[in-house]
């Protein structure tokens, strides 16, 4: 009694088709696909901008002591 039968789903489908029409549903799905495509493109554009910003950075630093230097000083 609590679950939907096939007749419930057919009635819902008929109401949706009456409200939106046959041509409107594919148009809506196309709009959803375009939105997803634009979202993915926007995300990849942001990643490219982040990579470009990070590639320009350099770190000029020198280690004070390395492992080899420590071994040399402890053996002497």
Swiss-Prot record:
Gene: tatA
HAMAP family associated with the record: TatA_E
Record region (Disordered): 43-76
Major localisation: membrane
Protein name: Sec-independent protein translocase protein TatA
Function according to Swiss-Prot or TrEMBL: Part of the twin-arginine translocation (Tat) system that transports large folded proteins containing a characteristic twin-arginine motif in their signal peptide across membranes. TatA could form the protein-conducting channel of the Tat system.
Oligomeric form and interacting partners: The Tat system comprises two distinct complexes: a TatABC complex, containing multiple copies of TatA, TatB and TatC subunits, and a separate TatA complex, containing only TatA subunits. Substrates initially bind to the TatABC complex, which probably triggers association of the separate TatA complex to form the active translocon.
Transmembrane segments annotated in the record for this chain: 1-21
Cell membrane listed as a keyword: yes
Basic and acidic residues composition-biased segments: 50-76
Localization in the cell: Cell inner membrane
UniProtKB keywords: Cell inner membrane, Cell membrane, Membrane, Protein transport, Translocation, Transmembrane, Transmembrane helix, Transport
GO biological process: protein transport by the Tat complex
Family to which this protein belongs: Belongs to the TatA/E family.
NCBIfam families named among the record's database cross-references: PRK00720.1, tatAE
GO molecular function: protein transmembrane transporter activity
Pfam assignment, any one: TatA_B_E
Keyword Transport carried by entry: yes
Domain of life: Bacteria
